[in-house]
Amino acid sequence: MYKITWDKETGGVLLHSRIVEGTLGISPRPVFFEELDLLGLDKLGWTYPHVEEPIMWAVNKQYWYRGVRLFDAKGANIYTKPTLEIQPGIEPMELVPVDVKKMLQRTSDLMFVLENEAIEFIRDTYLAYAKANKTYNKADANKLDFETMAERVEKKSKQRMAVVKQDCDSFDIMPLATAEKEGKRVLLSTKIDRFIASFSGGKDSQVVLDLCTRAIPPTDFEVIYSDTGYELPPSLALYKDVEAYYKKKFPSLRFLTARNHESVLNYWDKIGTPSDNHRWCCSVMKTAPLYRMLKVEGNKQARVLTFDGVRAEESVRRSGYNRIGKGVKHSTVINASPILFWSSVEVFLYLFRYGFPINIAYRRGITRVGCIICPFSSEWNDMVVNHTFHEELEPFLSRIEDNVKRNKVQDFRNYIEDGNWKRRAGGRDIHSSSAIDFLSSKPDLNVMLIKPQKHPLTWISAIAPFTGSEKQGELKYRNEVYSYKCENNGDVYSLSFKNTAKSLALQGLIKRALNKATFCINCEACEVECPTGALSIS
């Protein structure tokens, strides 16, 4: 949010409300002795103390000390540490840590404004939706689905509509432009079942959690950590420390941990390694367990307002996010991002100011704390993880190596070093005994299933009402009746849906249902997208 320059006296940074001489184009990150040890700087004649304070700063892979660029790190990959390219005229020296106390004094005024604005944003957002809840519960007239109604009006009128709260303690729908002109508070939902702070073990969620405790009563929100099975060891340890700290400070604050019922490596065997095209792990290991746990009465998906640590600086995609958004990742969730416009420097300054522990992963050089392995992680982070958490990474890395070798890739090590495993687009390395073959579609849809995961008719009820048995019957779709037959010989099923060629829409739905019956592995991802609660995976 603020502009940043080096502070040569403290070895830290200064914040400015406008561009000044020496303003940095990229937000730096603090570098601690653990990272310098990993890079082997001490073996090149440099000396520095092993202390809590950072020693220097990094801008991408350039390392700066009191405003002077000392060296660059070149050529890191998952197997190989980088080489250090010392800048001309720079000789090994004794490095002095950042004077954090003085740096915090010099940045205190602007940080005070920044954090209080975030607290006010959290409080205002919480109060707006908490009051909407009270209004919603006051009268049956309020319990209409105003959000769905607004969407329908939008489609008909071809203009953006908004749900607003009126002075008479009711809701109304009006054009968004009119609502903004009249100063109405636009609501993305008329009812929130649960307020949560999402905690990941990273610095951003750590700051947001603390801001939430300063803005919202501890009885009114929950802290949820998703243990994906990919967690870095220090992230798990930090979560336990954070839980103990806040439980002591706020005994009524609830902490919950969401986990999938199955091991992530089991899913690797069934679905294949995640890739930049098939990023299944986020929905299966994180989103599905989290929102399944939050379901309310009647198996319905809870309407949730999540305070998250998303920051625009992190990626081009996130730079386009609104500070409050509905359906960003999940249809029934509103995401509120209090620190959307903060820089990583400001996040670290907050942690330093209040004496919060820094995740060990940052101290060892990881730029973004997340999963232990990820198709979107950088070669740099892959290198740091493999050299500092090798034992935890090994089961995943060995699985990748085995897959690459099995596919007879020449020079598998270079293939993995270059990150080519992350670009898997097909299912060549998935060895499944289940298969489906659509034999014909005119006039009848004839299909053969081999070793399906479910009975072929399991999902047909989601398409239309049907009567009959597992062998034959009828289904009624758009006032037309279609008969079906299902025969099986061991693990092979043959199905025929009569005269369905006259309804391509029905054939498309049947194909989806049969595909799901063939390959469904109970990952739970579909259940949390069901808006009515009719779908349940067990």
Predicted regions and their residues:
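Local cysteine-cluster metal-coordination motifs and their immediate loop/turn environment
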Residues: 367-380, 517-532
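Ferredoxin-like iron-sulfur electron-transfer modules
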Residues: 502-525, 533-538
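Short cysteine/histidine-rich zinc-coordinating motifs and their immediately flanking basic loops
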Residues: 383-389, 531-538
